[in-house]
Every structure is written in C-alpha cells, then in structure tokens.
Amino acid sequence: DATAHQIGWKSLACGLSDIASMGGVAKYAVISLGLPRRLSVEFVAELYRGIKALARKFDVEIVGGDTNSSKALVMDVAVLGFVEPEKLKLRSGAKPGDIICITGSLGGSYKSKRHLTFTPRLKEARCLVNNFRINSMIDISDGLSTDLNHIARDSDVGACIYEELIPVSKDAKGINAA
C-alpha cells in the first residue's frame, strides 16, 4: 500500500517525466483533486506534502488547481514547461543507426516500491539534449519493450537491443526464477 506522501509524489513525478522525455524544463503544475469525504485532513495534508516535496526538488511552482468531493480519490496533474525548438525530442525522431541508451537500471520497482518514489530524469534529459545529438527520447514507464516499440513505430525504424547489456536492478534479479 502506498502512503499519502508517495501518492502525491508519484502523481507529480509522472507529469515531470513526460516533460523530461521531450528534453524540456518543467516550470508549473496544476493539481486537481476529487476527494472522498472519508479521507482525513491528515491524509490530504500528507498528499500535498508529497507533491510539494517533489515540486521543490525541481523548482516547479504549483500555480492552481481544483478540489472537489468524489466517491473515490481522483487526481489530475498537468505540468507545464518549455523546451527550445532545437532541443525538442519526440518519439518520432529516431534515425537508423541511433544508439539506444537508458538512464538507469530496469526492473524490480514493484518489489522495491521504487515506482512510488522515483525521481524523474529531468536533469539527465537536459544534460543529454545540451551535450549530445539526440534524435528521440521517451519515458519508459510502460517498460523498455513497449516504449521502444513506440519509438520504432512512430519513427518508422527498427531496433536491436542486446539483453546482456541491459542494466537490471538487483531488485529484479530472481523475480522470474520461481
């Protein structure tokens, strides 16, 4: 089970990752909540603390939103930012011969609960677009094979990956051994 802080953190982290995947800089967020009446004030305060903690880390300003009553917890997070036209990276930009790179180890997020507190790769993405000729990027939150397929399809290219070169998290090792 996720804590309120983790839920808040992850809700903003997903939007920040989308900005990072295009080479952008996140600036603002709008947070809208549908809150069941059964939730405590403490839960909601901790939810906002999770959002604010990540917003502070990346200098993102919460500029608005809405709060309503609902039967279930509903969160809608919109992140706004900017990217210089020459640094904009789309999933449709891959070219034959491009090298496929990732910025961290894969797998094990469920076991380690890392998926609840991951840090968006905004700094890494900006470093890449500022220092290298990058043709395409994507947030691989849906998994390497699924998201690599999105790039290949949208760019009309193929892809070849070498399993032995994929960095696998220690938390993922042995999961499928059973």
Each language-model region and where it sits:
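Short, conserved glycine- and acidic-residue-centered signature motifs
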Residues: G8, L12, V44, G93, ...
